[in-house]
Amino acid sequence: MTTTEFPSAVAKARFVRVSPRKARRVIDLVRGRSVTDALDILRWAPQAASEPVAKVIASAAANAQNNNGLDPATLVVATVYADEGPTAKRIRPRAQGRAFRIRKRTSHITVVVESRPAKDQRSAKSSRTRRAEASKAAAKAPAKKAPAKKAPAKKAPAKTAAKKTPAKTSETSDAKGGSD
């Protein structure tokens, strides 16, 4: 965890009719990403839980922009989690007078977005060029010969079992208990 504090904004959606386990599956896709990337990912995610999570992220971004005056381009999903809400219990009638319980789970989704300064493009470019130059230098340098491998020792010829020639058909029928 870093000790530097960035300006942030919070949004919560409570009593959302989605299981916390299913919401966490979607939340894990967007944690630590920029808000625009997160919304793009959730727009195309096939899970039903992606819609309420996207709404909360959009709400947190709007809170950051309107209440705190933060630049929406620098917003990052810093913290996002789903806690368990109350569970509504229903009954499903079953055979012979039995009843099974249906648990309709709810969750509380919390999103914290932070305005992190954009990473310096020069430093990213310089590291990229340094890597490219290093690979070019490695390609130009004469390649070292790999150490010579020892030739595998010749194995002694394996003793071959003497091949038995098939016996005459009359002998084989005698062995099987047949008669001529």
Swiss-Prot record:
Keywords: Ribonucleoprotein, Ribosomal protein, RNA-binding, rRNA-binding. One of its GO terms (biological process) is translation. Residues 142-166 have a biased composition (Basic residues). The keyword rRNA-binding applies. It comes from the Bacteria. One of its GO terms (molecular function) is structural constituent of ribosome. PROSITE patterns: RIBOSOMAL_L22. Gene3D superfamilies: Ribosomal protein L22/L17. InterPro entries: Ribosomal_uL22, Ribosomal_uL22_bac/chlpt-type, Ribosomal_uL22_bac/org-type, Ribosomal_uL22_CS, Ribosomal_uL22_sf. The keyword Ribonucleoprotein applies. GO terms for cellular component: cytosolic large ribosomal subunit. Residues 111-180 are annotated as: Disordered. SUPFAM superfamilies: Ribosomal protein L22. Residues 171-180 have a biased composition (Basic and acidic residues). Part of the 50S ribosomal subunit. This protein binds specifically to 23S rRNA; its binding is stimulated by other ribosomal proteins, e.g. L4, L17, and L20. It is important during the early stages of 50S assembly. It makes multiple contacts with different domains of the 23S rRNA in the assembled 50S subunit and ribosome. PANTHER family: CHLOROPLAST 50S RIBOSOMAL PROTEIN L22-RELATED (PTHR13501), LARGE RIBOSOMAL SUBUNIT PROTEIN UL22M (PTHR13501:SF8). Belongs to the universal ribosomal protein uL22 family. This is Large ribosomal subunit protein uL22. It comes from Mycobacterium avium (strain 104).
